[in-house]
């Protein structure tokens, strides 16, 4: 009986994770680095990594609004302009997109592979 409960909980968790991933893919468009470069200067560029990661290096022109603070700071992001998100490897940006969509953002883009795949200009704290 207890094995069955564990199996049901595990199956529910897997279904939740798949549903969350599918939803993220529907509400944000994942862009290649080339596509991302073509549009991010005309949009709001948000780095959702933590401050220590941001200070270690970030895309030139990005604002740091960590995922851990996004719900409290969501009003800093305009809903009438496109939002370009990135994190270290695209996991946190998907979760950030869900929060922003609930706040009214409709144009949300994500950097494929995240910052670790970025080959463009970066700024790092000295």
Swiss-Prot record:
CDD domains: RHOD. The chain crosses the membrane at residues 3-23. One of its GO terms (cellular component) is plasma membrane. Residues 39-123 form the Rhodanese domain. It holds the Pfam family Rhodanese. Keywords: Cell membrane, Membrane, Transmembrane, Transmembrane helix. Its main location: membrane. InterPro entries: GlpE_sulfurtransferase, Rhodanese-like_dom, Rhodanese-like_dom_sf. It comes from the Bacteria. It is a single-pass membrane protein. It is found in: Cell membrane. The keyword Cell membrane applies. PANTHER family: FAD-DEPENDENT OXIDOREDUCTASE, RHODANESE-RELATED SULFURTRANSFERASES. This is Uncharacterized protein YqhL.
């Amino acid at each position: 009986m207890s094995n069955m409960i564990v199996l049901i909980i595990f199956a529910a968790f897997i279904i939740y994770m798949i549903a969350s991933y599918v939803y993220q893919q529907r509400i944000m468009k994942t862009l290649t680095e080339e596509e991302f470069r073509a549009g991010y200067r005309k949009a709001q560029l948000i780095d959702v990594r933590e401050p220590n990661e941001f200070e270690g290096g970030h895309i030139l022109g990005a604002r740091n609004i960590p995922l851990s603070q996004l719900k409290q700071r969501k009003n800093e992001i305009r809903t009438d302009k496109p939002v370009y998100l990135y994190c270290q490897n695209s996991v946190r940006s998907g979760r950030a997109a869900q929060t922003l969509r609930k706040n009214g953002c409709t144009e949300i883009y994500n950097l494929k592979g995240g910052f670790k795949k970025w080959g463009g200009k970066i700024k790092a704290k000295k």
